[in-house]
Every structure is written in C-alpha cells, then in structure tokens.
Amino acid sequence: GVCSACRHYENRKNVDWDARFKEFEAYCNKYRGMNGPGGYDCAVAVSGGKDSHFQVWMLKEVMHMNPILFSVEDNFPMTQAGIHNLKNISEEFGCTIISCKPNIRAQKVLMRKFFEKYGKPTWYVDRLIYTFPLHMAAKFNTPMLCYGENVSFEYGGCSDKETYSAMDQIENGVAVGFPMEELVGDGVTENDLSRRAREAGPVLYELLCALEQLQELPDRQGARLP
C-alpha cells in the first residue's frame, strides 16, 4: 500500500492555493489591530524552524500584523544553530518571544516515568507545546493563533485528516491526554507543576472554556497558512 504521508503529499496538487491565500487574508483583515495601536493582534507558536520563520514573515512582513510569539523550552542543551534560529526570528522580524521553561525536577521524573510506562519520554514537553500557546493566546486576547504543520498528517501517523484549527493540533497523536494521576507521584506533587504544566494533564476543559470567551473567536477555527 501507499502510506498516508505520500497520499497527503499527492493531494497538494488539488489544493486551490489562491483561494486558500484569500481565506488567510480575510482572517488577517478581521483581526488586524484588534487590540489597539501597538497591541498584539495574532500569535504564533514558534520553535525557530522553517514553519516558524515562514509564518512570522508572512504575518509581519506580508500581512502587516503584529504577532506575539510563544515558545516551549525543553531544558536540553541547544545547538548553536538552534540558538541562532530562535534569536534570528525575533531579531529579524522585531517580535517578542515568551518562552515556557518547564520545572526541571518534574520534567526529569516525568520523562523517566512516561518512557518506562508508555515509551514516550518527551510527552511532558510535547503536551506543553500544544497547550502553552493556547493558554497564552487566551491571556493576550489573540484568537488568531497560528501553528506549523500537523506532523502526523504530513509525515505519517494516527491522524489522517488535516487539522484546520490550532485547537485541534493536540489531537494529532503526538501528545495524547493522560489523567492528572499519571503526572503526580514519585516525588512530584501538584505544587511542583505550574498552572500551565498542570493543564497538560487533564482534558483541557478549563483552557478551552477560556479560549471560547475570547472576543470574536472564529468558531474555534484558526487560519491555515498557505
């Protein structure tokens, strides 16, 4: 058979890119300047890679938006290239980056626990990548939040559909939900986990409620970048 990643790649030739760009442009027109002069009007989840640079360039330089960037650190040593890339995206486009640096003690315990029990050593950080930007978008009142590619859809995985909304990215199979009971124990208590980290455990009910209260949230759908 043919893998899902190859099928999805072939389907790209059927995409009306002009129509998709107009759809994206309409979202930008809707939210541009929504928080007043100098206020952030959109947000981007960034790592410093190819998706991050393209999205920020598109929003800032082409669409003349004022994005705020959210990033999650993993407490691992970064390569010089990685350090440069993250710095470059802020310096070249003149954007503020707010980073979440997880509790190192809790991360060590949870990485070992989830590796031994589920074979998912980076689950704790992966989950934060898909929850922290949503949480911060609610705080900054920026309902237009852009993520990069759905790795499960693009490269093969359990998700066989294109995720239209940034809120659905968490369903791509990379960081499935676990109950809070799986996070605490072995020396890790709820007090060891910040509110943002604790939200990585439950089913994000509280977080989704906060997002749905944002002004003019577009039916829980985020813009797709062309």
How would you name each of these model-derived features?
Residues 53-57:
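Hydrophobic alpha-helical hairpins/lids featuring a short glycine-rich hinge
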Residues 42-51:
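Short, glycine-rich nucleotide/cofactor-binding loops
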Residues 2-43, 58-226:
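Nucleotide-activated chemistry modules centered on ATP-dependent adenylation/adenylyltransferase
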